[in-house]
Amino acid sequence: MINHSSKNEIKKQISHIALIMDGNGRWASSRGLPRYEGHAQGLITLRKLLRDLKDSKLNYLTLFTFSIDNWKRPKEETSKLMQLLRKFISNDLSELHNNNVRIRVIGSRSEIPRDIVDLIKGAESLTVNNTGLYLQIAFNYSGRQEIINAT
């Protein structure tokens, strides 16, 4: 049994949470909806999570959102995923900045549309001095590729 002081110690130790945003398309398909609707619902859930974390002591949140392997999906689906990133940065940046969130996007930018790369750079630049939650978005990312690039 954990006593009250032990629970507080555990809470203090959590400083980084990483989430793999997977299964949204399957969730939508299982409900007879287009896969995109699942991804859009995932964005709604992410917004709620970020608002819930606003006053938390969490230091880092890493979101694995789009793997390099996701390029194997149909072009229509990858285009809609790009639209979601575009929408997230465009619509949510002001609120995130006002909540002192620092944004960093990791992953290869070479295949990402230029306008999205510009949005990413702008978000990172605007929030670089923020000292609250560090939101790291792994987009067009591969851990394996990162290891290969490091060697």
What are these regions (language model features)?
Residues M1-T151:
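Flexible, compositionally biased loop and terminal segments
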